[in-house]
Amino acid sequence: MAEQKRPVLTLKRKTEGETPVRSRKTIINVTTPPKWKVKKQKLAEKAAREAELAAKKAQARQALSIYLNLPTQDEAVNTLKPWWPGLFDGDTPRLLACGIRDVLLEDVAQRNIPLSHKKLRRALKAITRSESYLCAMKAGACRYDTEGYVTEHISQEEEAYAAARLDKIRRQNRIKAELQAVLDEK
């Protein structure tokens, strides 16, 4: 028994001369928020941006809806040219005589042309509201009938009206382009 094979366990005790010093609670300032909080904030910001963009798009869509959707000038020319080639100089529309819509509607009824009143009206609006047509309305220019004959000349008042109308159409086109840009952005 003199030899011990197993180590003897002893308790290490602190000396009584040292008393533990109680320190204040340390305050740790966290400079970066936790990852879950950052992710949650990003998702909230993204949802807010998407909601704002959706509201902008809805507002732009509503603002665009007040404008009449007319066919392009080329489509309007292609609609009318086969039946009334006298109204055009090549593919360029001539200045139309006053009251030509009624004449064309009568012609449609007489010749049984497969054009609805709506298509005819929209084609005439597209042509007469185009920038090239309004720019051509200068004092002294000729107006033409369905056969291509001169019926009357443009007066000073009509030229002034065309200039005012052209300004209005250009202003509307600018506004439409801005609204369309809002709709097209992501």
Curated annotation (Swiss-Prot):
Q: Which UniProt keywords apply?
A: Conjugation, Plasmid, Repressor, RNA-binding, Transcription, Transcription regulation
Q: Which domain of life is it from?
A: Bacteria
The Gene Ontology terms for molecular function here are: RNA binding
Q: Does the keyword Repressor apply?
A: yes
In this chain, the stretch annotated as Disordered covers 1-20
**Any transmembrane segments, and where?**
none
What Pfam families does the entry give? FinO_N (PF12602), ProQ (PF04352)
SMART domains (alphabetical): ProQ (SM00945)
CDD domains per the UniProt record, alphabetical = FinO_conjug_rep
Annotated function = One of the components on the FinOP fertility inhibition complex, which inhibits the expression of traJ gene, which in turn regulates the expression of some 20 transfer genes. The transfer genes are responsible for the process, called conjugal transfer, in which DNA is transmitted from one bacterial host to another. RNA-binding that interacts with the traJ mRNA and its antisense RNA, finP, stabilizing finP against endonucleolytic degradation and facilitating sense-antisense RNA recognition.
* Record family assignment: Belongs to the FinO family.
> Which protein is depicted?
Fertility inhibition protein
- Please report the organism this UniProt entry assigns to the protein: Escherichia coli O157:H7
What lineage does the source organism belong to? Bacteria, Pseudomonadati, Pseudomonadota, Gammaproteobacteria, Enterobacterales
Q: Which gene encodes it?
A: finO
